[in-house]
Amino acid sequence: MGRVTERRKVIRIRDGAVSTRPDTLVAEEPLEIRLNGKPLAITMRTPGDDFALAAGFLVSEGVLGEADELQNIVYCAGATVDGSNTYNVVDVRTAPGVVLPDITLERNVYTTSSCGLCGKASLDAVRTTARWTIDDTPPVRLEPELLASLPDRLRAAQRVFDRTGGLHAAALFTEEGELVDIREDVGRHNAVDKLVGRALQSGSLPLSRTVLLVSGRASFELAQKAVMAGIPVLAAVSAPSSLAVDLAAESGLTLVGFLRGASMNVYAGEHRIALRAAAAQG
């Protein structure tokens, strides 16, 4: 299996002085995901948790939703010039009797951090393929101070980022702010898929009383993945896209952006944020 990091020579220029030294870089390799032997998608990812990534991707596509729908996931043969396995192709086998959505069977996709359809078609696709509505009855209720503390907890748990400075992260927290799981990857979407895939494998879906925190911005794709996993709250340290806000509003997802220090913007689902308490303190 590929390594999470690799070493490369770098020429460093600092205060006019030039030096050569080895540097630790985050690894990036393609992963082909097959469904019952048929090619489905290719994503650029950081090696590691590949089976969880594939499972989470299929949850996001509306293909899987229950642990018993998954028979197994295996690496396929894919040799390098020296004959060793590249571990860059995985095949997801569904359990006998599982009926697959027709739209996924012959679809070949190259996924990136900004993949997805456009506008209303994207919103409709999520609505028609989602396994669950977001149902956190009684609603998750979060104090702004708790939300504000999460980015520091995320950063403290980023082990590979400390060595490379080049990874995104996604983390699941309980409504009390306890860290449930964290994954790192060169792509935020992959990090989320790894979280969701592990939840599928452990039979924990839907994630109805959790908070998903992502480094960087909140794209439509990340909002889609949250909705498809039944996550009620998505928070990001940077801005959301307009389509992410539209999806959140339509799906009942709480969407928080610019979560930095003691400030944040709430774009949708404000009923889960204790706004009155925050106003009283201000």
Swiss-Prot record:
Record carries keyword Cytoplasm: yes
Keyword Phosphoprotein tagged: no
Active site: residue positions: C115 (cysteine persulfide intermediate)
Keywords, in A-Z order: Cytoplasm, Molybdenum cofactor biosynthesis
Main subcellular location: cytoplasm
Any Pfam family hit: FdhD-NarQ
Cellular-component GO terms for this entry: cytoplasm
Gene Ontology MF, one: sulfur carrier activity
Location(s), subcellular: Cytoplasm
HAMAP family linked to this entry: FdhD
Database matches in NCBIfam families: fdhD_narQ, PRK00724.1-2
Name of the protein in question: Sulfur carrier protein FdhD
Organism: Streptomyces avermitilis (strain ATCC 31267 / DSM 46492 / JCM 5070 / NBRC 14893 / NCIMB 12804 / NRRL 8165 / MA-4680)
Gene (UniProt): fdhD
